[in-house]
Amino acid sequence: MRPLLVLLLLGLAAGSPPLDDNKIPSLCPGHPGLPGTPGHHGSQGLPGRDGRDGRDGAPGAPGEKGEGGRPGLPGPRGDPGPRGEAGPAGPTGPAGECSVPPRSAFSAKRSESRVPPPSDAPLPFDRVLVNEQGHYDAVTGKFTCQVPGVYYFAVHATVYRASLQFDLVKNGESIASFFQFFGGWPKPASLSGGAMVRLEPEDQVWVQVGVGDYIGIYASIKTDSTFSGFLVYSDWHSSPVFA
């Protein structure tokens, strides 16, 4: 019986197609076979997909300080700033030249009088019309120069009861002389005269009637006799008075 079974199995094995070693039909499991030889390296596979972004790493340590860069280009000009506070006053500067020219002028007239004037002496014109600088003395009748320069003096006299001769006098010397004859007519006559003269500080000018009968200067409420003078131009810059 046993030999018949063996023959039957061999016949089946010979008539069957080859089978994969791993698929040999077996009624009973056999022992594990020997390990096979390693296979050949396969071809390179396709690139895989990008992986997910990783998490942010921890902050790194501060780096070393770098070198300073080159200066940049000048920026645009800014808007004007607010006005600053006033500074302290500076020192006083040197004195400048006089911007207002010096002045000197006067005018006076005689009061009404029946008494003849003194001869060969200064003739007072006691009623002051203008004397802002105070250079004329109404008591003595003398003008005293304070501003050096060229002056003009004038006398306008009413002549009555006698002929009149008078002089413009500078420091005791006559600089101009004038005369008017009176012929006894009932109405007064007139006599005018003037002169221009250069004066220095403290020079004096006055009017002086002549000696003798030529003293017919007159004044009343309706007619006057006047003495006037004024500075034409000054050379004060060369005088110690204005130094």
Swiss-Prot record:
Region feature Disordered, mapped onto this chain: 15-125
Alphabetized PROSITE patterns for the sequence: C1Q
One BP annotation, GO: protein secretion
Domain C1q: 99-238
Key word Signal present: yes
Biased composition (Low complexity): 83-96
Keyword Secreted: yes
Alphabetically ordered keywords of this record: Collagen, Disease variant, Secreted, Signal
Top-level division of the source organism's lineage: Eukaryota
SUPFAM superfamilies the record matches: TNF-like
Any Pfam family the entry gives: Collagen
Main location (coarse class): secreted
MF GO annotations: identical protein binding
InterPro entries membership: C1q_dom, Collagen, Collagen/C1q_domain, Tumour_necrosis_fac-like_dom
Domain Collagen-like: start-end pairs: 30-95
Compartments it resides in: Secreted
Recorded GO CC terms: apical plasma membrane; bicellular tight junction; cell projection; collagen trimer; extracellular space; lateral plasma membrane; plasma membrane; transport vesicle
Signal peptide: 1-15
Assembly: May interact with ERFE. Homotrimer (via collagen-like domain). May form higher order oligomers by supercoiling of the trimers.
Disease the record associates with this protein: Late-onset retinal degeneration: Autosomal dominant disorder characterized by onset in the fifth to sixth decade with night blindness and punctate yellow-white deposits in the retinal fundus, progressing to severe central and peripheral degeneration, with choroidal neovascularization and chorioretinal atrophy.
Note: This protein is produced by a bicistronic gene which also produces the MFRP protein from a non-overlapping reading frame.
PANTHER family: COMPLEMENT C1Q TUMOR NECROSIS FACTOR-RELATED PROTEIN 5 (PTHR15427:SF27), EMILIN ELASTIN MICROFIBRIL INTERFACE-LOCATED PROTEIN ELASTIN MICROFIBRIL INTERFACER (PTHR15427)
Identification of the protein by name: Complement C1q tumor necrosis factor-related protein 5
Species this chain originates from: Homo sapiens
Lineage: Eukaryota, Metazoa, Chordata, Craniata, Vertebrata
Gene that this polypeptide is encoded by: C1QTNF5
